């Protein structure tokens, strides 16, 4: 009887171990390895902490910006887009970047003054980043991170559209104008 008791104990332990292993395997296959935009934090141009979780429920256009680029006049249309749709749960987030042609050499103070004086920018501008090392841009550009697409940011003013749940929807190149129907239709849900 002692041997029977030991066998039952071993079998019970093995069943528990099997159930735990099966649960772990199930979780591994059902849990997505991708994050959402809402998992990130960054610094604003003014140096304040910014939690992207605060954007839950809003559509977001993220753009890498530069003050000395041929596409710099897009600031005007980015601001117009933001002003038109900000009451409809839409925001624009600008990330100054000096990676392409050294076209954003200024300090945070310089960038803020330039954007305000020349384009009246009121949408959220973040601290200057490098595309190659920014965690948010890693998420935006790697399918293994965002679960949607791989993208190569080739120049300034590349745009990424992110839905209300923080999921990446689309990548658009520099020459896509901020008021392009593809963007406005997406904001309007068309």
Where are the model-predicted features located?
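N-terminal "domain-start" segment that seeds a small globular fold
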Residues: 30-53
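Local sequence-structure signature of Cys/Sec-based thiol-disulfide redox active-site neighborhoods
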Residues: 56-61
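Structural microenvironment flanking redox-active thiols in thiol-disulfide oxidoreductases
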Residues: 71-134
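Thiol-/selenol-based redox modules, centered on thioredoxin-like
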Residues: 137-138, 143-190
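Amphipathic alpha-helical repeat scaffolds
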Residues: 64-68
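Sec-dependent N-terminal signal peptides
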Residues: 17-26
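Positively charged n-region of N-terminal signal peptides that target proteins for export
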Residues: 6-17
């Amino acid at each position: 009887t002692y041997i029977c008791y030991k066998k039952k104990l071993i079998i019970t332990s093995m069943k528990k171990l099997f159930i735990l292993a099966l649960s772990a395997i199930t979780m591994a296959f059902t849990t997505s390895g991708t994050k959402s935009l809402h998992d990130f934090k960054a610094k604003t141009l003014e140096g304040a902490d910014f939690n992207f979780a605060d954007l839950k429920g809003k559509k977001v256009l993220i753009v890498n910006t530069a003050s000395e680029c041929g596409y710099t006049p897009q600031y005007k249309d980015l601001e117009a887009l933001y002003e038109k749709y900000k009451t409809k749960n839409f925001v624009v987030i600008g990330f100054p970047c000096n990676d392409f042609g050294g076209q954003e050499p200024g300090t945070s103070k310089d960038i803020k003054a330039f954007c305000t004086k020349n384009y009246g920018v009121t949408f959220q501008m973040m601290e200057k980043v490098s595309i190659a090392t920014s965690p948010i841009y890693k998420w935006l550009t790697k399918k293994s991170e965002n679960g949607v697409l791989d993208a190569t940011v080739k120049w300034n003013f590349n745009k990424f559209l992110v839905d209300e749940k923080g999921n990446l929807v689309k990548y658009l190149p520099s020459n896509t104008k901020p008021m392009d129907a593809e963007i406005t239709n997406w904001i309007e849900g068309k």
